[in-house]
Amino acid sequence: MTLHRPHLSNAQGALLGALIGDAAGATLEFLGRIPTPDDLDHALTLPGGGVLRLAPGQITDDGELTLALARALCDAQEYPTEQVARHYQRWISSSPFDVGNATRMAMDCSGPGHTTAHVQMATNARRHNLESKANGALMRSSPLGIWTARLNDREAVDAARSDASLTHPNLTCQWAN
């Protein structure tokens, strides 16, 4: 997909904003209390640390999956379900330092009887995560907003729901995506 200015600048801002927000929020994740204004100011310096002991500016699993989705969408004209699933599987195979439970359950494609990656992931997701309203699909969705900007509303919604269905098939998650 080719973007022209100012759309390119907007797309870059959306993607970088999501990644910076992820790195800032990582400091506050699992804090166990409501963050204070001082906590928020500190988080915006991207200090790292937190429960996950991240390096300064390091993104979490949410940011890593955002990048995996962005890479899968780069040259696609239609939502590439199988290619997206393979990018997600490549990511989970890299032994990431943190993975949300619903995401892990959906992406576990080990064992015999493999079908295509997206069918296996969607089957796992329906089996294990149908009742889950976790936010893992939403956390990686910024590339969808960029990629679907050229589509009509129905096509954009279908792409977002298809992506959510790979790991978070609950209808609330699909529509939130």
Give the role of each language-model region.
Residues 1-177:
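Structured, active/binding-site neighborhoods that engage oxygen-rich ligands
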